[in-house]
């Protein structure tokens, strides 16, 4: 999935680790990611958390998509910092999943908390032979 994610690539995201139900993704903040107050645009932080969430929830043979998500911003960040998003599966029931993503700065201080809700489809992940659900 991440190999074809042009948006994440354009933002310079790097996958640091993947395990079943878990993913770690980082990104160096650039000047063009800052808003009018010279702090990181919230959509950039959301995109990082959303990418970690997407990787964590696509650990099976079926395409899993977001059914909803929300984010709480805790601290501002600025250009030159590296953010790291760690997504963790909290619970899965049938086709539905719930994931928490913590976004931290260079000092491992939380700067945002994201909660994602997922829904697994019948579609196989590209390049895999998915068993029936």
What is each residue range found by the language model?
Residues 9-11, 21-23, 42, 63-69, ...:
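A generic structural signal for short beta-strands and their flanking turns/coil linkers
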Residues 34-54, 58:
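Compact, glycine-rich, soluble single-domain proteins
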Residues 26-28, 70-72, 86-88, 102, ...:
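Residue-level recognition of well-ordered beta-strand positions that form the cores
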Residues 77-79, 90-133:
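HotDog/MaoC-like acyl-thioester-processing domains
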Residues 54-84, 89:
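Hydrophobic beta-strand-centered segment that forms part of the acyl-chain substrate-binding groove
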Residues 1-26, 30-31, 129-133:
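Non-catalytic linker/capping segments at the edges of enzyme domains
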Residues 38, 61-62, 108:
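Detector for glycine-centered tight turns/loop "hinges" at secondary-structure junctions
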Residues 20-21, 30-33, 51-52, 79:
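Short, charged/polar surface micro-motifs in flexible loops or helix N-caps
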């Amino acid at each position: 999935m991440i190999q074809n994610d042009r948006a994440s690539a354009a933002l310079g995201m790097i996958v640091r680790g993947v395990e079943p139900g878990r993913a770690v993704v980082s990104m160096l903040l650039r000047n063009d990611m800052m808003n009018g107050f010279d702090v990181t645009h919230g959509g950039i932080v959301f995109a990082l958390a959303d990418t970690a969430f997407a990787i964590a929830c696509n650990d099976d043979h079926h395409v899993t998509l977001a059914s909803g998500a929300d984010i709480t911003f805790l601290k501002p960040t600025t250009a030159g910092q590296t953010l790291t998003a760690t997504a963790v599966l909290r619970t899965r029931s049938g086709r539905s999943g719930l994931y928490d993503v913590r976004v931290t700065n260079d000092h491992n201080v939380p700067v945002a908390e994201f909660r994602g809700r997922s829904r697994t489809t019948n579609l196989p992940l590209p390049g895999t032979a998915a068993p029936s659900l």
